[in-house]
Amino acid sequence: MSDVTLSRASSEHVPLLLELVAEFCEVDQHPYDPARVTLALGPLLDDDQHGVVYLVNQDSGYLVVTWGYSLESGGREALIDEIYLRRRGEGLGGKVMGALFVDMAARGVVKMFLETETHNRRARAFYARQGFDEDDSIWMSREISATE
């Protein structure tokens, strides 16, 4: 397989991204709301302030990375919010991660995070091969309503 290309998605790619996100949600059995996804994509496609959306080899998949900042990490952090590849088990994922690490270093990222389900051993093994460690910390979340 040839080298991987990560290209920054733009607003013209929304139809393709919605198709890819729908596929991802179907595979991972997540709810899919195209209106919510379109709204969330907007700021990421407008500029890099909040993060970046990449297309993998134009239409082989997508990757969403968002920014954070931490004293503990010593600077800029990146969270792999979503990654979806149409074809798996062919080595593309490792190439995508390698290209992503190069781009993240160029953007000043000092630490990367991701979250995957506990039961997804295949994903956990893949991420471990890419150098990610399982932390002892626990992710917690809370929805924030517009009326708070």
Q: For the regions a protein language model found, what residue spans apply to each?
A:
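Terminal substrate-recognition subdomain of acyl/acetyltransferases
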Residues: S2, R129, S141-E148
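Conserved acetyl-CoA-binding loop of GNAT-fold acetyltransferases
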Residues: A128-S137
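Conserved GNAT acetyl-CoA-binding A-motif
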Residues: A105-T116
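Hydrophobic adenine-recognition pocket in adenosine-nucleotide-binding enzymes
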Residues: A9, I83-L85, T116
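Conserved acetyl-CoA-binding loop-helix of GNAT-fold acetyltransferases
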Residues: L85, E90-V102, A125-R129
